[in-house]
Amino acid sequence: MKKTILKFSAILTATVIAASCIQESIPVGGSATQDQVSASDFALMSMINSMTASMTTSGTGGYAGSYGDHTDFGVPGIHLRFEHMLEDLATMADNPYYNRFYAYDLNQAQGPQYTYCAYFWKMYYTWIRLANDVIASMLPAIEDGADEETMIQLKHNLGQAYAYRAWCYLDLARLYEPKENAEVPIPADIYELTVPIIDENTTIDDCKNNPRVKRDVIYQFILDDLKRAEEYLDGASSSWSTPNHMMVYGLYARTYIELGYERKGYNMEMFEKAAEYAGKVIKESGKTPLTQAQWTDPSNGFNNATSNNAWIWGIGLSAENLNNLLSHTSHISNEAAWGYACYAQVGASQLLYDAIPETDFRKLSWLGPNKEEWSSGKYRFAGTEADKAAFLNGSGRPGAKPYSALKFRPAQGECSDFNVGNAIDYCMMRIEEMYFIEIEAKYHLNPTEGVQLLKDFMTKYRDNSYNRIQSGADFATFKKELLLQKRIEFWGEGILLFDYKRLDEPIDRSASNHAGVFKLRTQRRSPQWNIVITRAEFQSNTAINDSNNNPDPSEKIEIL
């Protein structure tokens, strides 16, 4: 594999060491000053684009250049980190270390002194800083006035920045709030602590003593940002590639379903809100779940927003900002000949695969155990017949194994040229997630209705013979079935970690097709999902230290 590394603009790579406010050309604190960011209309309009580019560019965090880290490609890389901390993404290779996310699978080096946990902190706060820059620049520009067309664009860009910032803080709150688990006790005085808030008004001095805020504070901040986003995005394009009302409503739904689960019980008002906003997206967006043809499309499957009607929000990846190895496709698509995936041989856990009935077309996301079926026409393969033969039989790389993943295709079905195959559209939210949020919320409000909604979704969109859960199912039964369907639906997409953590679900990597070194099991939610704050933050923020950090979970999970 060619290990070509691109050089990128300093505005994308020279960012932050965290929320720490070390003096830089643009402070990591609240935002850039007007001297640092041009007030021209062109500069203002382009600021939001620099943020989206930084979310997906190869080497965007500087970890590739500093440490040779080939998992440094922004949001898609973060989402793959989530997947490797769960149970269903199996590494099946004889040499499992082609899986470059192995530290997350192993639950090793997850403490504050390591880069593995630091990556989350650095990247989300980088994007928050960029959102703050946009907000700090747009607000005075709007106050100064402009012609009608420019004013509309300024407001829409401001709304996008608020939406992006809300998304960042929602992920951070869910990642860093410590939750009870069976392996690593949580000190009583850090329950419900999340992360420091940095907004457009935060100064460098503020950052030097900026504590973790409580759960209620961060979620109110998120809801306030979403309200502002909703206001400023009025009349904005409904394009999948930029925040719009449907994306904002989807973030509301994610936020409220999380708020429905409190440490000492449930909050029914929050479940009502979650159902309301998920329902708004379902009813008002005009979006529809993926069909079987779209799901299994060998050229466009999970890589092309315009090939389906399901995506609410996504990011288009440009070939100019990607290299062969630091990309989503090279780590998740077995059919891509240039990447790590075909050597790591990523697939579904056999335990998950065996739980899927043959009548559910989503089972076609992975090769079955019967090799005679592989060339029978049952499966659709990307590329040419030669590409198919190389993937199945091996040609300069290992041949496919049972349970190998087919879900994520190289762009345009291109299996050989990474410049083409890496330039995918990356999905951040699709309509199916809203159905599942509505189902979960409705169950808490009316169990019979929740079960029926799950049945309706499954029989209409996924498996018309579905009948796995009965009316009157208790919450434990419902939760298990709901999560199973989400595991099948969102495998590899970076959605599920938040479900597992919220629902207090264990992981079980005892399936025979997991690499031996990655086999482990938890009794409840994994302690690894209480992400540890990087020590780099301690060096500049006196309000955070070892005493109020999340406990280090490294090597505290049972190895099988």
PLM region spans:
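Flexible, polar/acidic helix-loop-strand segments at domain edges
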Residues: 358-429
